[in-house]
Amino acid sequence: MAIERTFSMIKPDATRRNLTGAITKMLEDTGLRVIASKRVWMSRREAEGFYAVHRERPFFEELVEFMSSGPTVVQVLEGENAIMKNREVMGATNPADAEMGTIRKVHALSIGENSVHGSDSPETAKTEIAYWFSDTEIVG
């Protein structure tokens, strides 16, 4: 089993409801370690840059508005198969389809306000981590 790093974000719908600790505990309970974390309020420009891959999608404008509407918590997680573990504990994008006990089943309000984001591949993880963290901010 490979030790990996992945990117995780707790979105504004969850931070508004003071769920940062509960969600982080769910992540840590899978064996993942938080090796970097900070609370940020994304500017519109930061949200557009972070979600640039979705620029041509019909939901892009709504996504940017939502992500810049309140604080988020950005984190780097580390552990065995961290990307897969993080995605499993997050649950399906649509909370209606998420398995019981996953973050989205427990905490998400809707498909748009689904509480968390996580990298889907090693390449994406590397890019997303570098977007928010310098090497000196990641302390394993």
From Swiss-Prot:
SMART domains registered for this protein in UniProt: NDK
Coiled-coil residue spans: none
Gene that produces this protein: ndk
Physiological role: Major role in the synthesis of nucleoside triphosphates other than ATP. The ATP gamma phosphate is transferred to the NDP beta phosphate via a ping-pong mechanism, using a phosphorylated active-site intermediate.
Organism: Bartonella bacilliformis (strain ATCC 35685 / KC583 / Herrer 020/F12,63)
This protein's name: Nucleoside diphosphate kinase
Disulfide cysteine pairs (residue numbers): none
PANTHER family, alphabetized: NUCLEOSIDE DIPHOSPHATE KINASE
Cofactor (UniProt): Mg(2+)
Family annotation (InterPro entries): NDK-like_dom, NDK-like_dom_sf, Nucleoside_diP_kinase, Nucleoside_diP_kinase_AS
Biological process terms in GO annotation: CTP biosynthetic process; GTP biosynthetic process; UTP biosynthetic process
PROSITE patterns: NDPK (PS00469), NDPK_LIKE (PS51374)
